[in-house]
Amino acid sequence: MASNYKVQKPKFLEELEEVIDIYDEILDRDKLQNKIIENETIEGLVNKGTTIDSCVFKNIVFNGTSLRNVDLLDTRFENCDLSNIDLGDGSIHRVEFINCKLLGARLDECNIRDVRFSNCLGKYINLSYSKMKNVIIDECDFTEGTFQQVKLDKVNFNKSNLINSFFNKTSLNKIDLTTCDINGIDVEISDLSGAIVNSMQGLDLTRLLNIVIK
């Protein structure tokens, strides 16, 4: 189902500068701004409180990367591998993840606003305790993702795989899941109140009631 929510897009300069040494920019200056980074592997980048503003990452592989408390603004990740990256306790605003791998990525305890995940492989992604507002998750695989105690406000799940995902203590009120695969989703009955599901999904969710339908 198409989203009725307006998600702001990242804002960039018309021309972005190529990065000479991303480690110097982030580790020594704690800031990366108005840059484009392409076709690189970034190894073992660990920093806390980094600001990344108005940047584009294309075809980047992040290995052993931890940027907790990151301030991520007006940035696009395209065809990147962010598997197991740690962006926990960060602020993620006007950011796009396009055709990215997010296997086991940590975005827990984040403030996530005006963000689009499109065609991403995000099995085991962790979004626990985050606040998500004006977010689109479009044609993504978030199998066995963890959404524990997440505050969802105007979050659109479209044609995405949520098989065996964990939504403990996360209200799904007004959340439309009709185009998604939610088989085996782990959620409390009280948090399903107001959720929008199709008839087949509703039948599957009766397992939470411990009843038998003949």
What annotation goes with each model-predicted range?
Residues S3-K214:
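Tandem repeat scaffolds
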